[in-house]
């Protein structure tokens, strides 16, 4: 999993096929098994397959996941969950939500927990968990249909995998960034939180210094809009460049950690077990409460 591959994954939503092929040229894929999840037309997909073959790829496998299954709702019932749910949301894209999802998965698995997970990237199956269903982004379905369908989708995962904890990554942002970049109006986060009730919510922010007033206002926003309060704030290393605010695609720059004291987490906290211990303590309290 090289930096070049990571660049393709991060940018494929707005890269042209020529840019994708150029990026793939940099990858050392000879004699390797290549997995891909196609979100292209058949001609562009074939171009990528041909390039991989010409570069000596050992095998090329199209990933087929639960996210490819068509939306289906058998009844208008919202099922309750017996498993604690940890959700990762963000104020926007490029707030390192996926890094957080991988961090949580790794730490919980290392501690011996059985984890089920639905992530924000279309290639989550490469990391042995489910991608967000495609119909969550399909405008032909109503919000109501998506709420019931996601509830049933996650319930099937719980019944089949029998996890001890479920991790959900919420795509896009919870609110619009500006008039140009609406970030789906936060609808996906609203639909997910209407379908399930997270027991622990991590909110990822753009890089910057934040006041307690801002954090309180953000918590009130999720409390009344998503019906869940924020347990932790995470400050990412990315910040949108002001020169791209009104352009078709925003550009992000990498920045070092800002000073926010102990009230916010950042990438350095992933190097210790303080954060994961806090999460486990909260989930343990949840389990004890359920038993009582």
Where are these regions (language model features)?
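Conserved nucleotide-sensing/catalytic segment adjacent to the nucleotide-binding pocket
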Residues: 129-172
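Walker A (P-loop) phosphate-binding motif
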Residues: 71-118, 215
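Short, flexible helix-coil linker/hinge segments at the edges of structured domains or between repeats
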Residues: 52-88, 120-142
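N-terminal phosphate/diphosphate-binding loop that engages ATP/GTP or pyrophosphate donors
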Residues: 103-144, 219, 223, 245
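Conserved catalytic-core segment of NTP-binding enzymes
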Residues: 36-53, 60, 66-68, 148-149, ...
